[in-house]
Amino acid sequence: LISRRVRGLGVEADLLPADTPANALDHYEGIILSGGPASVTEEGAPMPDANVFGLGVPVLGLCYGHHLMVQMLGGSVRSTGRSEYGKAVLEVKDPDRVFDGLEVSQTVWMSHGDLVESLPDGFKVLGITADCPTAAIGNTDDNLYGLQFHPEVHHTPKGVDILRNF
């Protein structure tokens, strides 16, 4: 679904396995780490090549990808013990790149059981919801962004705009 949304924006998109070596990705203009059913708190969770964050291209982590990026770069993620599933109201605190030109309050779709507990160095909170104080984060110097919500689904009305901004 993510690739379909990106292609719908007129951008070429390839769907690659999580274990693709970073040196095979250096010709891309951006990388999206997708969501999925796994948890970074579990043994054997799929992990990308850590060098993906040093390629000098923008990286967007969505849900599980958001958790991966945080954990791999030195932040922490914990299981909430329950799932958040459904609509939430995102309050944009810093209208950086991904939220440029968008409303400061918008509906987003959540589907997760883990939560970012602490941010890696260089990251800041870009948006929050009532139940998620790290719903959108970014390291704007390195063009690394993480979203707890799912911009690719139609339940996030401005999701395509967020992907376009990325």
Segments (PLM) and residue ranges:
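Flexible gly/pro-rich beta->alpha loop and the following alpha-helix that scaffold active-site loops
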Residues: I2-L62, H66-H67, Q71-L73, R164-N165
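Residue-level signal for well-ordered alpha-helical positions
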Residues: I2-R5, M72-S76, L102, G122, ...
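A conserved active-site-flanking secondary-structure segment within enzyme catalytic domains
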Residues: P17, A50, V57, H67-G113, ...
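Short, charged, surface-exposed secondary-structure boundary motifs
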Residues: L25, G86-K93, L119, I137, ...
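Proline-centered loop/turn at the N-terminus of a beta-strand
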Residues: G56-L60, T107, K124, N143
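Histidine-centered divalent metal-coordination motifs
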Residues: C63, H112, H150
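A glycine-centered loop/beta-turn motif at secondary-structure junctions
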Residues: L119-G122, I128-F166
